[in-house]
Curated annotation (Swiss-Prot):
The lineage of its organism: Bacteria, Bacillati, Cyanobacteriota, Cyanophyceae, Nostocales. It comes from Trichormus variabilis (strain ATCC 29413 / PCC 7937). Pfam families: CinA, CinA_KH, MoCF_biosynth. Belongs to the CinA family. This is CinA-like protein. NCBIfam families: cinA_nterm, molyb_syn, PncC_domain, PRK00549.1. SUPFAM superfamilies: CinA-like, Molybdenum cofactor biosynthesis proteins. InterPro entries: CinA, CinA-like_C, CinA_C, CinA_KH, Competence-induced_CinA, MoaB/Mog-like_dom_sf, MoaB/Mog_dom. Gene3D superfamilies: 3.30.70.2860, CinA-like (3.90.950.20), MoaB/Mog-like domain (3.40.980.10).
Length: 416
């Protein structure tokens, strides 16, 4: 017994609209413990919709459709489903009355095209839409097969799912077990290297462990099936602890943790402060830090020293070093960190200087070369050299630079 999500809409295929409905429904199915192995996006074409249904019924017992329930000619979901299963469409007086009242409440008269939304397969139950004019259906066209249809408007679909579909599914016995997941996050290690370290855990039956790469980071999704979230967490906890022990400092957080939030909590707990000096990241590091509510407890501010005159004038970088070594060098990175730490009187300081591209690289200093400075209590200062590669774009290099700077400080705070 499993479910399949089928999202109908050419606008989804063209990328005009982000398919948030599939994400929402996938999360909801997990909360009900309903297995879910496939999602499909298909355009507003009856033949292709039928092809998708043909495949879906061979591997799933619950089909959940979103989109294609409107009044226009290209809204074909309901009639195509009915045609596939050989069922006639019947007009629902209840739906006609509901649509008529909604138009009247808005001071309008229902258009003839809206009558199309009242056509449902014979024998289907209405899935009421409290806010819009597009109702859905719950239909069992054959034994051991249930079909749900929802409008594509997310707010309407969410409410209809919660108020009608969830009670129906729970009445069918679903929801007695849930699928609960925790996302373990890692920085400073590649996906393949991490997978090799935790290979013994990748074939566990319950909880399951699966690696996937994010934007510069790696995640392990640990999922358990259990009667409750508490029971699932009890299954996950020992596996999570063992993986953390194996990964060491490469592990940095779970679920919605970010490097900025983790660093922030470490600084807050120690009563210490941070400032930043940025060149190639242009304020991105400061933005990451200030996205965290309450970051003013530990983040004093920063200097965007894009031009060398600012590096020298505001941060006290030696002009001779700038001329001789260039702005992208370990010496300049260290002086930037010392300068902003001194100027803002903070415990710690981070600096970033590099070549984000796509222009500006040379044979000796290619695009992707970045130096990160870290200044700490007393006279502590050091720098780190990274080459993030010439094949990555400007945005990604800046992102890697800012996150790596946060990770360096995180590791320093944890190992002092």
């Amino acid at each position: 017994m499993s479910a399949e999500i089928i999202c109908v809409g050419t606008e989804l295929l063209l990328g005009d609209i982000l398919n948030g409905n599939a994400q929402y429904l996938a999360q909801q199915l997990a909360q009900l413990g309903i297995p879910h192995y496939h999602q499909t996006v298909v355009g507003d074409n009856p033949d292709r919709i039928k092809q998708v249904i043909e495949i879906a019924i061979s591997r799933a017992n619950i089909l959940i459709f979103t989109g294609g329930l409107g009044p226009t000619p290209d809204d074909l979901t309901c009639e195509t489903i009915a045609d596939f299963f050989g069922s006639p469409l019947v007009e629902s007086p209840e739906i006609i009355e509901d649509i008529t009242q909604k138009f009247a409440q808005r001071g309008r008269v229902m258009t003839p095209s809206n009558r199309k939304q009242a056509l449902i397969p014979q024998g289907a139950d209405i899935l009421p839409n409290p806010t819009g004019t597009a109702p859905g259906i719950i239909w069992e066209p054959r034994p051991d097969m249930t079909i749900f249809t929802f409008p594509g408007v997310p707010s309407e679909m969410h409410r209809m799912w919660q108020e009608t579909a969830v009670p129906f599914l729970k009445n069918q016995g679903w929801g007695q077990e849930i699928i609960y997941s925790r996302s373990l996050k890692f920085w400073g290690i590649g996906e393949s290297a991490l997978a090799e370290k935790v290979t013994a855990y990748l074939n566990l039956p319950n909880p399951t462990v699966a690696p996937y790469a994010g934007k510069g980071e790696v995640r392990l999704r640990v999922s358990a099936k259990a009667p409750s979230e508490v029971a699932a967490e009890a299954l996950i906890a020992p596996v999570e602890k063992q993986i953390k022990d194996i990964a060491g400092l490469d592990f940095y957080g779970v679920n919605h943790d970010s490097l900025a939030s983790v660093v922030g909590e470490l600084l807050r707990s120690s009563g210490e402060t941070l400032s930043v000096a940025e060149s190639c990241t242009g304020g991105l590091l400061g933005q990451m830090l200030t996205e965290i509510s309450g970051s003013s407890d530990y983040f004093w501010g920063g200097v965007i020293s894009y031009d060398n005159s600012v590096k020298a004038g505001l941060l006290g970088v030696n002009p001779e070093d700038l001329d001789k070594l260039g702005a992208v060098s370990d010496t300049v990175a260290e002086q930037m960190a010392i300068g902003v730490k001194t100027r803002l009187s903070t415990t710690w300081a981070l600096s970033i200087t590099g070549i984000a591209g796509p222009n500006g690289g040379t044979e000796t200093k290619p695009v992707g070369l970045v130096y990160i400075g870290l200044a700490g209590p007393g006279d502590e200062v050091t720098s780190f050299k990274y080459n993030f590669g010439t094949m990555r774009d400007r945005s990604f290099i800046r992102h890697l630079s800012a996150c790596t700077a946060l990770d360096l400080l995180r590791r320093r705070l944890l190992t002092r």
